[in-house]
């Protein structure tokens, strides 16, 4: 049996649609977001994968994405573990604000630093490094042991929590990871060798 991990960023949320900084705020999925999650579940079912356990954040947009995927895979009864360790990066004082209005107030350059710097956080928020400092230890302690037992694991989470995880999994540096974008609702499938190194990476496109 292969050691397999599937990562997926939640489908489009109501605040993605409104161009708002979301972070730890908890809007639901749009109809498009639900459609993205359902399509991802159908694609994953076509691969023949069966999950042994699933993880998601404490936020409903990720939870609903996971639930829609599991329904399509006829695994609705699978244990779904919810943890704030996998939450999106906390955008602090920017949370709930319109991104264009934030740029007008603080300037494009400052907003770009907050969004894409690895170490600099927005006021009262988290940097990507801060996000990784909670995501990676949780992965090592709770999730990786399942993979090392040749189980197949789903993580439905968020753009920045997944970027932090991918950075650690793939050994990327801060410059490499800040340039990576994760589309909503697109599964990334990793398989691993017995020493936890990556054997393969596949992006399942619609």
Swiss-Prot record:
Pathway: Carbohydrate degradation; glycolysis; pyruvate from D-glyceraldehyde 3-phosphate: step 3/5. Substrate binds at residues 9-16, 22-23, 61, 88-91, 99, 115-116, 159-160. Pfam families: His_Phos_1 (PF00300). GO terms for molecular function: phosphoglycerate mutase activity. InterPro entries: His_Pase_superF_clade-1 (IPR013078), His_PPase_superfam (IPR029033), PG/BPGM_mutase_AS (IPR001345), Phosphogly_mut1 (IPR005952). Keywords: Gluconeogenesis, Glycolysis, Isomerase. SUPFAM superfamilies: Phosphoglycerate mutase-like. GO terms for biological process: gluconeogenesis; glycolytic process. SMART domains: PGAM. Its EC number is 5.4.2.11. The active site is at residues 10, 88. It is an enzyme of class 5 (isomerase). It catalyses: (2R)-2-phosphoglycerate = (2R)-3-phosphoglycerate. The record marks 158 as: Transition state stabilizer. Catalyzes the interconversion of 2-phosphoglycerate and 3-phosphoglycerate. Homodimer. Belongs to the phosphoglycerate mutase family. BPG-dependent PGAM subfamily. This is 2,3-bisphosphoglycerate-dependent phosphoglycerate mutase. It comes from Bartonella henselae (strain ATCC 49882 / DSM 28221 / CCUG 30454 / Houston 1).
